[in-house]
């Protein structure tokens, strides 16, 4: 089992949109939407890891990590490897930009990436797509009202 600490950017615009990435698990083919982020390197702070991951995955280089808004523990299998990771989600206020994934050094990660999309909170609530965390819509709604979640984010996908 691979254990790791992960940081994720909840990149929100003033008009209630959030940047998500659609990814596909290589073995099962299951597709779902996630926030940009990834694992910390040895000695790296959460803030530095978040800046690095966002730059690698979206091309955005002027990211100012905001407050820690959610955390969760999740166990899953990816590419026939078992993971146990603790994820920390940081709010990042931003204007919309056109994301590009050309700085990701891990080819395996780049090949699992399918697309970016700026989702409105309302569209997430109405969608039949799969999001990670599964309760992303309610978490975003609470965040927009400055209400902390009652517990950890749903482990979901």
List where the protein language model places each region:
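Hydrophobic (often cysteine-bearing) scaffold residues that line and stabilize catalytic clefts
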Residues: 3, 42, 46, 132, ...
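Unchanged
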Residues: 40-64, 72-129
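Conserved N-terminal beta-strand and adjoining loop/helix that marks the start
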Residues: 1-19, 39-42, 66, 89
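Short, acidic/hydrophobic/Gly-rich beta-strand patch recurrent on exposed beta strands
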Residues: 21-23
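A short gly/proline-enriched turn/hairpin at secondary-structure junctions
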Residues: 33-35
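A conserved beta-turn-beta hairpin within the catalytic core of GNAT-like acetyltransferases
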Residues: 27-31
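Charged phosphate-binding loop/patch that engages nucleotide di/tri-phosphates or the phosphate backbone
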Residues: 127-157
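Acidic surface patches and DE-rich sequence motifs
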Residues: 13, 25, 78
């Amino acid at each position: 089992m691979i254990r790791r600490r992960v940081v994720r950017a909840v990149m929100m615009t003033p008009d209630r949109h959030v940047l998500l990435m659609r990814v596909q698990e290589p073995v099962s083919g299951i597709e779902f939407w996630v926030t940009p982020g990834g694992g910390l390197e040895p000695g790296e702070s959460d803030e530095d890891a978040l800046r690095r991951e966002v730059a690698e995955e979206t091309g955005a280089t002027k990211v100012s990590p905001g407050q820690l808004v959610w955390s969760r523990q999740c166990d899953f299998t990816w590419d026939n490897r078992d993971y146990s990771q603790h994820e920390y989600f940081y709010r990042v206020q931003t204007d919309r930009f056109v994301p590009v994934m050309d700085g990701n050094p891990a080819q395996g990660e780049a090949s699992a990436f399918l697309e970016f999309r700026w989702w409105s909170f309302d569209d997430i609530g109405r969608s039949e797509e799969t999001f990670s965390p599964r309760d992303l819509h309610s978490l975003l709604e609470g965040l927009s009202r400055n209400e902390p979640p009652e517990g950890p984010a749903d482990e979901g996908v």
